[in-house]
Amino acid sequence: MNIHALGEGSFSVDSTKKFVPFNPLADNPQDRKGSLFIHVQPFLLKTEQDLILMDAGLGFKNGNGELMLHDNIRKAGFEPEEVTLVLMSHLHNDHTGGLVVEKNGRTGPAFPDAEHVIQRGEWETAFLGKSSSYKESIFEVLQRSANVTLVEGSGIIRNGITYELTGGHCRYHQVFKIASAGKTYFFGGDVLPEPEQLIRKFAAKYDFDGRKSMELREQFGKLAAAENWTCCFYHAKNLAVGVVTMNEGFSVKSPGN
């Protein structure tokens, strides 16, 4: 399989927006009242031309002091230096922590040779300093030392890779579609973060425009079913990569089933 879910674990998030590790087998949700419980997994996709990272996780380190994202990329059979393209759905903290890494007391890009594709409006929003959802110091490092491509609206990155400005979760959220080896991969970021959100219709209060996100999920779900997309779910609890079918409603199954 060319797509790899780089799981970073399960977390609880309260009103402080701090991500605290949560072990469903040992921790009691009642001890964390008022919290959301989510999983985090960036994705790595090998195409004919690129090694693509889709969003970058929390930036946590493992027990050896290594960036967890780097460790997970190696476990998938690649080296972090091989990543050529970093596609960012948006720039909230839980999607950007792994974009930078500290070595010998200095912080630099975690993927110095990769092109980072970011919506210009989202980039500018991150520098405003008006929301705790963004960590400005990360973007200062990227601005100084990384290859950043700022895009606007919707378009083509290169052959087979497209981006679409959606809004919904935040004003400048974008999604990506990648055609490779006869398959189409769809990364919906936080507009379509879990397969369950296709099955259960709701407008989330944590979205910038919850109703629009709900409508987008319906739209993308229908396209995914009609065109046999392989969907990547960044906050999925169980099924991180799935294909969508639609009869009376949506269902999602593993690509191999």
Where are the language model's segments positioned?
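Zn-dependent metallo-beta-lactamase
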Residues: 1-49, 245-246, 254-257
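Core dinuclear metal-dependent hydrolase active-site scaffold
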Residues: 2-8, 42-46, 52, 153-181
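Active-site metal-binding loops of divalent metal-dependent hydrolases
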Residues: 8-10, 56-59, 91, 121-122, ...
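Short, P/G- and charge-enriched loop/turn segments at secondary-structure junctions
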Residues: 27-33, 104-105, 163-164
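Active-site HxH/HxHxD metal-binding segment of metal-dependent hydrolases
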Residues: 51, 58-144
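Metallo-beta-lactamase
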Residues: 59, 74-75, 110-165, 170-244
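Histidine-centered catalytic micro-motifs
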Residues: 86-96, 166-173, 233-238
